[in-house]
Structure formats: C-alpha cells, structure tokens
From Swiss-Prot:
This is Pyrimidine-specific ribonucleoside hydrolase RihA. Keywords: Glycosidase, Hydrolase. The gene is rihA. One of its GO terms (cellular component) is cytosol. The active site is at H240. It comes from Salmonella agona (strain SL483). Coiled coil: none annotated. NCBIfam families: PRK10443.1 (NF007761).
Amino acid sequence: MALPIIIDCDPGHDDAIALVLALASPELEVKAITSSAGNQTPEKTLRNVLRMLTLLKRPDIPVAGGAVKPLMRELIIADNVHGESGLDGPALPEPSFAPQSGTAVELMAKTLRESSQPVTIVSTGPQTNVALLLNSHPELHAKIARIVIMGGAMGLGNWTPAAEFNIYVDPEAAEIVFQSGIPVVMAGLDVTHKAQIHAADIERFRAIGNPISTIVAELLDFFMEYHKDEKWGFVGAPLHDPCTIAWLLKPEIFTTVERWVGVETQGKYTQGMTVVDYYFLTGNKPNATVMVDVDRQGFVDLLAERLQYYA
C-alpha cells in the first residue's frame, strides 16, 4: 500500500525536483501539496507548485497556499539562489488549474481528517504552515505519522554561520515542530551537502531525453551557478530537498542517528541554529532522527531511475 504524504514546500529548484521524484514514485501517494513563503514570496511559490503540477500533468492533486510570513518575523527570501521567479532557468508552463480556496492549514487538516491511516508530512521550506497546523489542530496530531523536514544542521549554517536557511526564516515554527512529540526526521546540511549533483550527473539526466528529465537538467544548470562560488568548496550543487523524499523511498542509502534537537530563537549569533545533542549531554530524550550521511551515488542513481518514469 502506498505511503500517504502531504508535501509542504517553497519551490525553489530543489523543491521542484523533490516534487518530480515524489510523483514518479508509486510507493508514495501525494494527497495534497501546500506552499510556504521562503525561497521566494508566497505568491511565487504557490504559482511554482501549480506550474510544476501542470508540467507533470497532475491537476488532480489538491493545492493550497500557506502563510504569507513567518510566525513572529518578517519574511526573508532566497532570490539570490533561485532567481526572480523562484524557478529561473527552464521554460515552465503557466498553471492550467487553480489552487483550492482554503488555506494550507485547512487543506492539511482536511487531508489528515479524511485519511484512513496516519499521514507523513514532508516539509521542504520554512516550518510555518506545519507549526500553524500543529497549534490549531491538536486533535489531529495522532493522524500524523511523522514530519520529515529539510532544515537545520549539526555543523555549519548556510545563511548565517550557525543557521540553515529554512530554519532561520522561522525558528519559532521549527521549535514548535521539534518539540511537538510527533516523530521528526531531519535532513540537514550535514547530509544534503553530501548529496551533490555533479556536472556529469546533469548530463546523465539530460540524456534520459524525456521532457521532464530535460527540465530537471535545466533547473540544475541554473542551480549549479550559485554553488560554483569557491567559498562553498563544492564539486557540484547540493540537492537539499529531494533528500526527504529519497529517505522515504530508500532509507538504506542514508545514515541516521536518534538525537534531541532544539532550535535557538534568541541567540545573538545563533538564531535559527538547530542544537543537536549529539553526545547526550542534556538528558533530553531523542525527538528526531537526524540524517548524517548519504551514499551519493545511490542518491543520484535513484533520481535517474525515477526520471525514466516520465518517458
């Protein structure tokens, strides 16, 4: 039986590729997709969800737009990474259908309520929508199997020295998610920076030769440019968000540890930092499965294999 999931995302090149991977995978049943502000403004990320689903011919999936800003802060966007549209690079279709009239939280709640089994929430942007859902619907917590997030880092940040972008945008929301008592799986920079796509991998995807694999290659062409800055020391581009979907499909290609994680909301230098109790120093029980390593070749092979689904 396919695993029911809700995807909350802020497309974003890597979010878009996570959608491509999820919708090429019969092991997963994508029940709803909600958009958050983050990589771009809320209007643009919602439009990008609709553009991707139009491209993938999946207007049957309910879509709703989410919170327009973080719980307690002003919105920061990553247009320096993702461009003016949020998905700069390829020529994507205009949306062929409209989102639902309700909010992301309403769509998530309805989806959970109507599901006969617990649903996994995959969140690849800031945690604002998920936190709002948890706070407004305590009666639905039992219907959430787990929350798989792309965010945080045990080590170095990518937006500030201490903080990864998604968590930094809304640290209060992320703290609500981690302390919710619902199992959390964290794909942080420790693993996503190892899930790098190299130039040869992009050519491999392009050579698959179907319209979707070509678009993925073009998304990666653009995404590569930002990551060529030598300060990162990367060979390729880290494909952050697809790690969440890849873990659901093939957990064996990832190495994980069970640890307690808290989010710093106040620090002078460390706001948005995910504090991972690696050495069990706090006495707190683990609340998260933290990804720490990935078989890069296995990850690339999984993407290439699933891109052939669109032939």
